[in-house]
Amino acid sequence: MAEKPKKPQKLKARLPRGLEDRDPAAIRATREMVEKIRAVYELYGFEPVETPAMEYTDALGKFLPDQDRPNEGVFSFQDDDEQWISLRYDLTAPLARYVGERYGTDGLVLPYRSYRVGYVFRNEKPGPGRFRQFMQFDADTVGSATPAADAEICMMAADTMEALGVQRGQYVVKVNNRKVLDGVLEAIGLAGDENAARRLTVLRAIDKLDKFPADEVRKLLGPGRWDGGEEGKGDFTKGANLSAAEADVVLAITKPRDDWKEAIAAAEAYLAKSEVGQAGVSELEEIAKLVMASGYGADRIKIDPSVVRGLEYYTGPVYEVELLLDTKDEKGRPVRFGSVGGGGRYDGLVSRFRGEPVPATGFSIGVSRLQAALTLLGKLDTRPEFGPVVVTVFDRDRVADYQKMVASLRTAGIRAELYLGNPKNMGNQLKYADRRNSPCVIIQGSDEKARGELQIKDLIEGAKAAAAIASNQEWRESRPAQFSCAEADLVAKVREVLARHDVSWG
């Protein structure tokens, strides 16, 4: 007995982990948000530039000294000339390569002010809220070492939040300086390569000051902390093993204060013997004076010595935009929404291509994360966008007539489409238009054609009327929101329907 032929295997449709598909409503909300950010950046004199999604891996700084393969965190492949190429993991490293190629030429005016928007890619383990592809929107000034450039970035970040509808009191731009943190580590005797691991532990503890009370952070600075609330309960995090006096110094300098002058005074007092620490304090003081002179109070921009950001990357001031909103974590517990963007000064990044110092400072907004926050605030229109006006096909042999109607609507700037499914059932055509969220449909049978007329069915008004009609018979007799007009009046009458319901397309 012959074997039955095997059915061809169907390919399973599945999305790789850490990625997401996006629907029209989400795309429209992103576009609306990006345009508002763009308007603020351009108001400050920043101009757009685009760099490719791929760069040579060494340009991204993703080779370790003892490896001939890119280290973790990037998606990479070898070109046919055996050069390693990687997908960009941020928008700053490609900018450094772009500037390095053009530095000193007529094609680059210094200080160079640019913005970029696009997707970046991280080869990391995905999880809740952690994606392998996400959008960033950056602005950077290259070629200016003055704290005025850093102050401007902070002011622009504040203006961007307000342009997006985030009110004062719902956000704050927090500013610190890498040099201040280096001074803190110097003051407690953790200079030198032999203390690298302890320095990192101290910085991680400081970074917890916005999440834990000072007493809990003190445990992380000391022997360690049990996350169950008492010894022996929960997981244990090993601490930095600082003495009580050393922990006092760290907490005194990094304590968040509402008055920037108090924050500066505390840092100055404890970092008097640290040259690098004093330089950082001086830069913070200059930034504070500049933003205050421009009318930005501590409710918008504040000095916060507890801010810790990507310390291997930054060389001076660092900034973080925090949303002061309460949301819930995956266990339903109330938590602060937290950071939606940040940046800082990175004077060493461009210099890799130049062999000389090139000052630079910039700011990056996590578009996807900020969009989630704005949706939570109700600042983005997440309703489905109106679909096009649908011209139905009543008579199969008159498709050319219907296509002419579609063309006249499009010429007038009205979104329109011809129904391209099986025209046998008019009910299915109307269901299609309804599912497409169309504001109205156009119907013309042979009788209407003979009279030089057509029918316009207002689907929005029809839905409202349907809710008030008790029986199918009443529905058939009344045919709510459907009216006739002359063929020549098609565009004008459709415009009346659109205006009645404030229909517009972004």
UniProtKB/Swiss-Prot annotation:
Q: Which UniProt keywords apply?
A: Aminoacyl-tRNA synthetase, ATP-binding, Cytoplasm, Ligase, Nucleotide-binding, Protein biosynthesis
Q: Extract the signal peptide range.
A: none
Give its E.C. classification number.
6.1.1.21
Q: Where in the cell is it found?
A: Cytoplasm
Enumerate the GO terms in the molecular function aspect: ATP binding; histidine-tRNA ligase activity
Q: What does it catalyze?
A: tRNA(His) + L-histidine + ATP = L-histidyl-tRNA(His) + AMP + diphosphate + H(+)
Give the GO cellular component terms, alphabetically. Answer: cytoplasm
- CDD domains per the record? HisRS-like_core
Q: Which domain of life is it from?
A: Bacteria
Which family does the entry's similarity section mention?
Belongs to the class-II aminoacyl-tRNA synthetase family.
**Assembly behavior:** Homodimer.
Protein name in the entry? Histidine--tRNA ligase
Query: What is the organism field in this record?
Result: Bradyrhizobium diazoefficiens (strain JCM 10833 / BCRC 13528 / IAM 13628 / NBRC 14792 / USDA 110)
The gene behind this protein is: hisS
